[in-house]
Amino acid sequence: MAALFVSLLALTSLVPVQGAATVPQTDYAKRAERVLKSAPLIDGHNDLLYAIRRSTNDQIYDGKLPFETSLKGHTDLPRMRKGRMGGQFWSVFIACPSDPNAPINTPKFATRDTLEQIDVARRLVDKYSKDLMYCDNPGCAKRAFREGKIGSFIGIEGGHQVGSSIAALRQAFYAGARYMTLTHNCDNAWATAASTVRAGKPDLGMTDFGPALIKEMNRLGMLVDLSHVSHQTMRDVLKITKAPVIFSHSSAYEVSKHLRNVPDDVLKTVAKNNGVVMVTFVSSFVKVDDPDSADVNTVVKHIFHIAEVAGWDHVGLGGDYDGTTELPKGLEDVSKYPYLIEKVLEAGATEEQARKLVGENVLRVWTEVEQIAKKIQRSGVLPVEEVWKGRNGTALSERSTFIEGPAPLEYGCD
């Protein structure tokens, strides 16, 4: 009888492997490997492209960018493969103006530079097409994973990058961008940034022009990214969006009270919205009181807190690799993802929950955003034409009599 009990106990410590032998419940490395074989690990935010811009001026054909062997930062092909990555949202980041107090309508080159970043993203993926696959929809992302490639998607990190223009946003979408973070570390014509509140200024949330942006992003099927925005902006957007939102690289405010993180009331609303919060690894965000002591378990704590408050359907991963110099011990570069999943399983997550975390959740959100967009478009909703009233620009701040009848040519074109 004792022998039978021991045998039964041994059986309970095993979990089935699809089409293979059983694996001990406590063999977290093998269980993590199984998770990453069955679901694509999709990271919500990586700034490698900005590092390329700063180091090579977006020149990738001269042999000076050894992406296929080893780069100095956090990301290259060998480490992505070691990290079992199945998909990456590449940020086409361009920094805010150097003066955060500069008027929003000050002329700048951010939109031009953003298009150049989209261009280098597409060229990089094409150059390494044996390993990477450019995708602009979730079906393609799944196909890339089945074919053993790393799905590569594009996200814009801040409304300043499209000049606070809905028409410019639309063209960025047509060029391939599939999410836009509403702000970076500067306010724009649509919303207040978290950095503004950190600087001691009031949290004004969305502007009167903000709803027009959300309406158009919903219509296009463009993911609304609420990382970097103020807490009130988060709440304002969640009240009006018709589609799920993402936080491409944010963590839990209750665990670490940094304004870049998401408070519990917003986490609960994200669950109702069916969105996803993709946990970032930046040490000063995940452990604001002692960043140097942050480690992989610190990040696991954020993952579990979001899962407890919002549910396992609403948590994902967005490391912010190559966008920070502060990373927890054990998560030094993109190769460390399997170790993180080991720790998540060791902390008590099921493999089903881990699959949701690594990629199934963000793919579900992306799919729903597309479905809602198709429904909106079928209903006959036209592109938003509204422009920001505070902008500078030829013929937009003045009204001519052209549409009312013959008028003198007020603006020369020759």
Curated annotation (Swiss-Prot):
<feature type="binding site">
    <location>
        <position position="260"/>
    </location>
    <ligand>
        <name>substrate</name>
    </ligand>
</feature>
<dbReference type="GO" id="GO:0006508">
    <property type="term" value="P:proteolysis"/>
</dbReference>
<comment type="function">
    <text>Hydrolyzes a wide range of dipeptides.</text>
</comment>
<feature type="binding site">
    <location>
        <position position="320"/>
    </location>
    <ligand>
        <name>substrate</name>
    </ligand>
</feature>
<protein>
    <recommendedName>
        <fullName>Putative dipeptidase TRV_05564</fullName>
        <ecNumber>3.4.13.19</ecNumber>
    </recommendedName>
</protein>
<feature type="signal peptide">
    <location>
        <begin position="1"/>
        <end position="20"/>
    </location>
</feature>
<keyword id="KW-0479">Metal-binding</keyword>
<feature type="binding site">
    <location>
        <position position="249"/>
    </location>
    <ligand>
        <name>Zn(2+) 2</name>
    </ligand>
</feature>
<dbReference type="InterPro" id="IPR032466">
    <property type="entry name" value="Metal_Hydrolase"/>
</dbReference>
<keyword id="KW-0862">Zinc</keyword>
<keyword id="KW-0224">Dipeptidase</keyword>
<keyword id="KW-0325">Glycoprotein</keyword>
<feature type="binding site">
    <location>
        <position position="228"/>
    </location>
    <ligand>
        <name>Zn(2+) 2</name>
    </ligand>
</feature>
<dbReference type="InterPro" id="IPR008257">
    <property type="entry name" value="Pept_M19"/>
</dbReference>
<feature type="binding site">
    <location>
        <position position="45"/>
    </location>
    <ligand>
        <name>Zn(2+) 1</name>
    </ligand>
</feature>
<keyword id="KW-0482">Metalloprotease</keyword>
<feature type="binding site">
    <location>
        <position position="184"/>
    </location>
    <ligand>
        <name>substrate</name>
    </ligand>
</feature>
<dbReference type="GO" id="GO:0070573">
    <property type="term" value="F:metallodipeptidase activity"/>
</dbReference>
<comment type="similarity">
    <text>Belongs to the metallo-dependent hydrolases superfamily. Peptidase M19 family.</text>
</comment>
<dbReference type="Pfam" id="PF01244">
    <property type="entry name" value="Peptidase_M19"/>
</dbReference>
<feature type="binding site">
    <location>
        <position position="157"/>
    </location>
    <ligand>
        <name>Zn(2+) 1</name>
    </ligand>
</feature>
<keyword id="KW-0378">Hydrolase</keyword>
<feature type="binding site">
    <location>
        <position position="47"/>
    </location>
    <ligand>
        <name>Zn(2+) 1</name>
    </ligand>
</feature>
<keyword id="KW-0732">Signal</keyword>
<dbReference type="GO" id="GO:0046872">
    <property type="term" value="F:metal ion binding"/>
</dbReference>
<keyword id="KW-1015">Disulfide bond</keyword>
<feature type="binding site">
    <location>
        <position position="157"/>
    </location>
    <ligand>
        <name>Zn(2+) 2</name>
    </ligand>
</feature>
<keyword id="KW-0645">Protease</keyword>
<feature type="disulfide bond">
    <location>
        <begin position="96"/>
        <end position="186"/>
    </location>
</feature>
<feature type="glycosylation site" description="N-linked (GlcNAc...) asparagine">
    <location>
        <position position="392"/>
    </location>
</feature>
